[in-house]
Amino acid sequence: MDVIAGDFRELGYAIVANDALQSLIKDVRAKFERHFIPRFGDDTTRNRNIIKLLAEDVDVKRFFCSPDLTAALDRHLGIAMPVQTGPIVTHYTANDRIGNNYGLPYHQDWPSMGTSSRAVIAWTSIADVRKGAPGLSIVPGSHLRGLWPGKQTDRGYVLDDQAIDGACDLEIDAGHVLFMSPYLVHRTLTSEVTDWKLSLSCRFDDFSCDQWSRRGFVSAYRTAVDRQVYLSGF
């Protein structure tokens, strides 16, 4: 996979491209449109559950575990032993069909991970993202300041300063992969576009990181089991 935009070390992000992964994302989009969207209804909880299940689709897992992607982590970011330190996350941000139009303001992902300083987020969209459509706005180079002043909320670590200069709206083709530092300042864009936009992300760390080892390989993510859910719907 070749870097087609950005510089991870200097700017905090890099976009990489691969024909095979783009083809795989086309299959995921077709599956989403054919099998997932028709199941949407007025029940927002059910809709959210449907969206979450796309993250468990076998082709989506193949995408984030592909040899091409893991090789790119090593080649471009120096992550020799990548491990997933969180689930694959869905971001459905075009409208309120799932009951949430996120529009998350400027924030950083590191406090929601809490793993190593070498962590990285791999993000992709299953539809092309162009200006004026919902997507991401990033502040290149902002990762070099480390953790900015902010507050941890239920939605993430939101920055105190929301009047930030130097931001740019990303344009990215479906299936291209954005590697992003967890310290990179970014926000989720909304728009008046009525069509849906769905992106997916997964967080990686380097198991060979000595600093993370000294911290006991901690992670902010936990696995929880609701042992009463089997009673619902009856």
Model-derived segments and their meaning:
Residues 1-106, 112-113:
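Non-heme Fe(II)-dependent double-stranded beta-helix
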Residues 107, 114-131, 171-172, 179, ...:
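Short, conserved beta-strand element in jelly-roll/cupin
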Residues 18-20, 86-88, 125, 141, ...:
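Short, well-ordered beta-to-alpha junction loops that form the rim of enzyme active sites
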Residues 3, 27, 36-38, 177, ...:
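Non-heme Fe(II)/2-oxoglutarate
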Residues 13-15, 121-125, 167-169, 177-179, ...:
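Conserved hydrophobic/aromatic beta-strand scaffold that supports enzyme active sites
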Residues 129-189, 209, 217, 221, ...:
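Double-stranded beta-helix
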Residues 89-96, 110-111, 118, 126-131, ...:
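Short acidic/polar capping segments at secondary-structure boundaries
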